[in-house]
């Protein structure tokens, strides 16, 4: 019986070692991917800073102007859609306003 116990213990330890090795490799792979993502984010941030520096504008001023332009763009189509949606969504109301019964 002692031989079987020794063999079983050796098999378990080999399995355990393999599992641990796999886990270590997985962790190393995750760390490498995270490192790559961080590097990409840092590189992207550096490129943005370079672009704004080339424009000669402060970040604050440019952002405010961009926000104003976006708001103006958003307001136009939203108002049109709202009026169209009201006309389509409430046909009974149109009929009563036009003199027809609902």
Swiss-Prot record:
Where in this protein does the record say Phosphoserine is found? Answer: 2, 5, 13
Among the GO biological process terms of this entry, one is: immune system process
Positions with biased composition (Basic and acidic residues): 13-37
**N-acetylserine is carried by which residues?**
2
Highest taxon of source: Eukaryota
Q: Which InterPro entries match?
A: Pro/parathymosin
In which family does this protein belong, per the annotation? Belongs to the pro/parathymosin family.
Sorted alphabetically, which PANTHER family does this protein's record hold? Answer: PARATHYMOSIN, PROTHYMOSIN ALPHA
**What is the name of the protein in this document?**
Parathymosin
> Where is the organism placed in the taxonomic lineage, from the top?
Eukaryota, Metazoa, Chordata, Craniata, Vertebrata
- Provide the gene name from the record: Ptms
